[in-house]
Amino acid sequence: MKKKVMCMLLTGMMAASMIAGCGNSGNASANAAADTNTDASTDASGAADNSTDQSADVTPDTTAASAAAESGDFDNSEYINVVSREDGSGTRGAFIELFGVEEKNEAGDKIDNTTDEAIITNSTDVMLTTVSGDEYSIGYVSLGSLNDSVKAVSIDGAEATVDNIKSGDYTIARPFNIATKGTPSDVAQDFINFIMSADGQAVISDNKYIPVDDGAAAFESNGASGKVVVAGSSSVTPVMEKLKEAYVAVNSGAEIEIQESDSTTGMTAAMDGTCDIGMASRELKDSETEGGLTATVIAMDGIAVIVNNDNPTSDLSKDTVKGIYTGEITSWDGVTE
């Protein structure tokens, strides 16, 4: 539990540090996340001194798990600190669907069964920092955002790689969408044309994402100038920044402003007209298309399940990941062979 307290504190600090870079909706989410984590840390501090005794009682297999862990410092009897994304995150939406964490109830409504014990992070960067700083945590990020600060585990024996996604061996993948409402401005359309051209698709491929059109034509700008506001998913943002850099290099009259938040906020902004192009790391919801949005898939991306670099776990089944995120599996001795 001490690990979890530290993780909550780290998450709260990271969420607070990112407030300045987000829009109003992002600010509210980050503040809420930071306040919640601070309160949770305060509440948990009183129980922290008893964490050793509590973790020792996790399962009847504690003795065997401890013996298996003698070869290293990783203690299998520790609780799993589950780290998830916020409501509204396209990555969370895709993750819970692909792993079966989201299920329909008797009324046919979709229910997110993510454990209430999950630590909530409000961006890809905070997720990476949280897992990299907590030896006993587990999380998930866009494959294109994966770096060596954490370790991606294989799912059912398949590594999270572009080639495995293309071959179908790694099935945890989703689309990156952009969305517009009505007829885009000339400069917004020019930027979209760049993204879907051979030039734009090459940028996508170069940044570890999967292009959707290998036969796209070379880009020819319409010469439009002006400002384009692009808002939404923190998973799509990194590759959108790369696309922006490449585009303005060939059309210096264009100004591209990227506002990072989450998929739902981006789609709402596109519907409201407060941005020109929305970003979503998932399929659009019926309510969003009914609200007048037109989606364009610009890339495919995998979702990598991540653990701390000091965690010896290298492979998990989809059922095990589901069990962890629904709270059925609570300690690493229920995972590590």
Language-model regions, residue ranges each:
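Positively charged n-region of N-terminal signal peptides that target proteins for export
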Residues: 1-5, 10
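Alpha-helical transmembrane segments
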Residues: 12-16
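C-terminal motif of bacterial Sec signal peptides marking the signal peptidase cleavage site
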Residues: 17-21
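Exported/periplasmic ABC-transporter solute-binding proteins
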Residues: 23-39, 43-337
